[in-house]
Design a protein with these regions (language model features):
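Short, Lys/Arg-enriched N-terminal segment that forms or immediately precedes the first helix
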Residues: 1-9
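Amphipathic alpha-helical dimerization/coiled-coil segments
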Residues: 4, 88-116
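N-terminal helix-turn-helix DNA-binding core of bacterial DNA-binding proteins
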Residues: 8-52
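A cross-family signal for key residues in well-ordered alpha-helices
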Residues: 22, 36, 56, 91, ...
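Beta-hairpin "wing" of winged helix-turn-helix
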Residues: 61-73, 81
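Accessory beta->alpha helical hairpin/"wing" motif in late/C-terminal subdomains of nucleic-acid enzymes
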Residues: 82-86
Length: 116
């Protein structure tokens, strides 16, 4: 069975904020650049429209710092970078993700042979 883009989005919903923090951990980026970085790392179905609500929440929660820079031929771009709180949240989130992923893998491994 092929994973549909909709199902992939549902599965990513809980961890996309971690992925966004990861791609702006060391170098700031604006929205389009962030989606490009995510795609380069394998998240091909993530679009700009799906990240902006998350970026707004990350900014409100103090997990990203922002600044604006002029762009060629357009309005200024808003750049995002992980704040110190964002770095801590990312580290904690990665630990939690690995723990949950391990638990889910354990459950699915028990039935994997019978499903394949």
């Amino acid at each position: 069975m092929t994973v549909t883009p909709q199902r992939r989005t549902e599965l990513l919903r809980g961890v996309l904020d971690l992925c966004l923090l990861a791609v702006v951990l060391d170098e700031p980026a604006y929205g389009y650049e962030m989606t490009r970085r995510l795609r380069e790392r394998g998240l091909s179905t993530v679009g700009e429209g799906s990240i902006y609500p998350l970026l707004g929440r990350l900014e409100r929660d103090g997990l990203v710092a922002t600044h604006r820079e002029a762009s060629e031929g357009g309005p200024p771009r808003k750049y995002y970078r992980a704040s110190p709180s964002g770095r801590s949240a990312l580290a904690e989130g990665v630990r939690a993700w690995r723990e949950v992923r391990g638990e889910v893998d354990s459950v699915l491994a028990t039935i994997e042979a019978g499903v394949a």
